[in-house]
Structure formats: structure tokens, C-alpha cells
């Protein structure tokens, strides 16, 4: 097996997508190339437990650990969606010792566009 080349990136972007059923965290370099990613499902949670803030924190911890090994010290975070895991992912990166320089909220908000789906009973 060939050795994996060590990547050294001093700063990057973290994209967090929080849907009502799952949380996906991906890390990119400043030009947008994905370096690593994790979701509540890939970390080992299935079904109802994927929705929890704890599972989002575990996924964020996994990405934070990988990013720290790549030498990334500061990140800009882009949050998207209305799921429960947003605050937990921010805390996970802060507790991992990574400096968060900017937090952007890019949740799509319709200006009276399509009709939303019916609420579950």
C-alpha cells in the first residue's frame, strides 16, 4: 500500500449542513477542495440517534481531530439548515483548540416560494 501524502493547510473552511434527520460536517481548503468529512451516520449512529446534538458533536470531533493533524489552526465556519447540531459543532471545534475566525449562517430562507411539506402527525 502506498503511503498517504501529508497535507499541510494552515487555514480552511468548515461547512456544516444540519438537516432535521442528520448533520454533515466537511472541511475544505480555502479554494474549496474537500479534505475530510463526517456525518452522524458515518460516525456510527443510525435511525433516531442521528438527529441528536450529541451525534453532531461526535462527527465534528472526528473532523476537528483530522483537521488538527493537517496543521489547520484557524477556520471559517459556514452553517446551513435548521437541525439541532449547529451549536454543538461550534463548541466541538472550539474545544479542539481550533480558532474560529468567522461564523456565517447560510440557511436558505424562501421569500414566499414553494409550499412547504405538511407537518407529520
UniProtKB/Swiss-Prot annotation:
GO MF term set: rRNA binding; structural constituent of ribosome
A GO biological-process term: translation
SUPFAM superfamilies reported for this sequence: Translational machinery components
Coiled coil start-end: none
Disrupted gene: phenotype observed: Probably essential, it was not disrupted in a global transposon mutagenesis study.
Ribonucleoprotein is among the record's keywords: yes
Keywords annotated in UniProt: Ribonucleoprotein, Ribosomal protein, RNA-binding, rRNA-binding
Domain of life: Bacteria
Example of a GO cellular component annotation carried by this entry: cytosolic small ribosomal subunit
PANTHER family: 40S RIBOSOMAL PROTEIN S14/30S RIBOSOMAL PROTEIN S11
Subunit structure: Part of the 30S ribosomal subunit. Interacts with proteins S7 and S18. Binds to IF-3.
Family of this protein: Belongs to the universal ribosomal protein uS11 family.
Function statement: Located on the platform of the 30S subunit, it bridges several disparate RNA helices of the 16S rRNA. Forms part of the Shine-Dalgarno cleft in the 70S ribosome.
Record protein name field: Small ribosomal subunit protein uS11
Species assigned in the record: Mycoplasma genitalium (strain ATCC 33530 / DSM 19775 / NCTC 10195 / G37)
UniProt gene name: rpsK
Amino acid at each position: 500500500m502506498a503511503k498517504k501524502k501529508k497535507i499541510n493547510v494552515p487555514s480552511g473552511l468548515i461547512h456544516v449542513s444540519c438537516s432535521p434527520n442528520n448533520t454533515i460536517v466537511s472541511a475544505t481548503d480555502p479554494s474549496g477542495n474537500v479534505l475530510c468529512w463526517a456525518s452522524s451516520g458515518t460516525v456510527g449512529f443510525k435511525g433516531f440517534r442521528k438527529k441528536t446534538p450529541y451525534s453532531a458533536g461526535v462527527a465534528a470531533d472526528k473532523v476537528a481531530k483530522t483537521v488538527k493533524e493537517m496543521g489547520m489552526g484557524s477556520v471559517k465556519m459556514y452553517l446551513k439548515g435548521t437541525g439541532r447540531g449547529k451549536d454543538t459543532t461550534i463548541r466541538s471545534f472550539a474545544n479542539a483548540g481550533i480558532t474560529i475566525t468567522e461564523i456565517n449562517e447560510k440557511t436558505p430562507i424562501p421569500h414566499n416560494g414553494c409550499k412547504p411539506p405538511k407537518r407529520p402527525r
